[in-house]
Curated annotation (Swiss-Prot):
Gibberellin A3 binds at Q22, Q68, T141. One of its GO terms (biological process) is defense response. InterPro entries: Bet_v_I/MLP, Plant_def-hormone_signal, START-like_dom_sf. Belongs to the BetVI family. GO terms for cellular component: cytoplasm; nucleus. GO terms for molecular function: abscisic acid binding; protein phosphatase inhibitor activity; signaling receptor activity. Binds gibberellin A3 (GA3) in vitro. PANTHER family: OS08G0374000 PROTEIN-RELATED (PTHR31213), PHYTOHORMONE-BINDING PROTEIN (PTHR31213:SF64). This is Phytohormone-binding protein. It comes from the Eukaryota. It comes from Medicago truncatula (Barrel medic). Keywords: Gibberellin signaling pathway, Pathogenesis-related protein, Plant defense.
Length: 156
């Protein structure tokens, strides 16, 4: 059964800049935002919308796995929502059978954005949930968003 974990953060960056970075510019931005973790991000198939397949290549020795393939399963420019589902590698190599992160961006003001994050996951064994806790994976996501904020504020 798929479980969900929700969290949110507020970033001091405008909605449009965040949306562009997390959607159409994701392959360029992620390696710059996480240069000590992500070697590169490549589009394997698609045009950036629903169904687009991405591969995130990690630097050797940093993560327990060296790559993660993801598919964009949600993409809505009106609600500024993007969902990325891991389909190979990454958390799936750590015992999860399903893992998806959905970001929804909402403007608070011209230079402030609320980011709602929903992590959906499933696993074969309760022992796996102890090993790959959603709170821990959400911390990684919030760390990424904080680094993204710094990157965009520094004139990216």
């Amino acid at each position: 059964m798929i479980k969900e974990f929700n969290t949110q953060t507020t970033l001091n960056v405008g909605l449009e800049a965040l949306w562009a970075a997390q959607s159409k510019d994701i392959t360029l931005v992620v390696p710059k935002v996480l240069p000590n973790i992500v070697k590169d991000v490549q589009v394997i198939e698609g045009d950036g919308g629903v169904g687009t397949k991405l591969i995130f290549n990690f630097l050797p020795g940093i993560a327990p796995v060296n790559y993660q393939r993801e598919v964009i399963t949600e993409y809505d420019e009106l609600s500024h929502t993007i969902g990325l589902q891991v389909v190979e590698g990454g958390y799936l190599n750590q015992g999860l059978s399903y893992y998806k992160t959905t970001f929804q961006f909402s403007a608070i003001s011209e230079n402030k954005t609320l980011v709602n994050v929903k992590i959906s996951y499933d696993h074969e064994s309760e022992l796996i949930e102890e090993k790959v806790k959603p709170t821990k994976t959400s911390e990684s996501t919030l760390f990424y968003l904080g680094q993204l904020e710094k990157f965009l504020l520094n004139g990216a």
